[in-house]
Amino acid sequence: SIHNIVQGNTIIANRHPEKMDYIVSNPPFKLDFSEWRDRVESLPEVSERFFAGVPKVPAKSKDKMAIYELFVQHIIYSLKPDGQAAVVLPTGFITAQSGIDKAIRQHLVDHQMLAGVVSMPSNIFATTGTNVSILFIDKKNKDDVVLIDASNLGTKVKEGKNQKTVLSPEEEQKIVETFIKKEAVEDFSVTVSYEDIKEKNYSLSAGQY
């Protein structure tokens, strides 16, 4: 209920230490957290909870600190051994060849807890031009992983001063059915093994397979 809503900082004061069955999240991508960044690194559970590291404070553009890297690690940490999650992330996350992004992907693959990735069309959010992908985590999936490139789907529409891409119900259904069935569709999706992903330097981009 509304009385149970509390404003706080999940990263430095986790009010839900119990493990979760399911998590759905659209975390902030970039945010200046330089004032409390060192507090994160001093948390007693930091090595387990933030296994891939805590972003450094840059000399400039502190407002572009990649706070999503903290949230996705927190989500992985918060899942039960058979838990599942869906997380909206900047598409750059799925191909970054170094740093925390790659370390997170490597953790997901090496520990076999990945269901798949759907790369969405540009401007799927009207208020930002950042391309996004949806990362699906499944701690019990030891089989193939499905990677979908949905970037060419959708229709461009104007929303106020901004342009937005809108998926039709049929396109949404195509994504859902392809993902659930783990289908390989030419120029749209691939199914890959964890070993395949390792050979591609842990890339989660369908276009690289």
Please report, for each region that a protein language model flagged, where it lies by residue:
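S-adenosyl-L-methionine
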Residues: 1-17
